[in-house]
Amino acid sequence: MTQTTDPIADDPRFPWEPPLAGTELEHLLGMLNRLRWTFRWKASGLDAEGLNKRLGPSELTLGGLLKHLASVEALKFTWEAFRTDPGEPWRSADWSSGDDWVFASAADDSPDQLYALYDESVTNARRVIDKAIADGGIDQLTEMGDDQGNHASLRRVVCDVIEEYGRHTGHADLLRENVDGLVGEDPPEGWRP
């Protein structure tokens, strides 16, 4: 990511803040980063009971969302964008039922496993994005496309992941409030996973 001298984005107390006046790329990656931090905060510090708690008739859980967003990070920025190996557990997963297994299987994973899987997926995705931008920029075409041979730009892939986070960070707000009453838009000053 391009370096900035923005007093907000460069404040180590608030690493999730996007720049106030950055480039398009800085804003795009800054928003993705902010959503990642906010989601991780909403899902943080819970035991298995908290990660598996549901709200109303929904089958969504914070544990399921952790594993789902880990899969989004891993698959969008490896296999879908560049046809590179996403690693385990994604490589050997049974995708015949779509991604339902991701949500359902999260209940079998420990909190430590879920947090590690998510954190590793985000770290790897950041590396892939940084390298791809250095090699070809945000406008480069990826392998993701439609059935007519049109390919999506890396910008489109990043926007798809932002959309996914927007949807599920909203779910995480409600699920976390239902677990222990935690509310808020941003992590508290100095928070780290």
Task: Report residues per predicted region.
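Short, contiguous alpha-helical
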Residues: T2-E17, L25-D100, T142-P193
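Conserved FAD/dinucleotide-binding core of flavoprotein oxidoreductases
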Residues: A21
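Acidic/histidine-rich alpha-helical segments that form the ligand environment
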Residues: G98-Q140, S153-G166
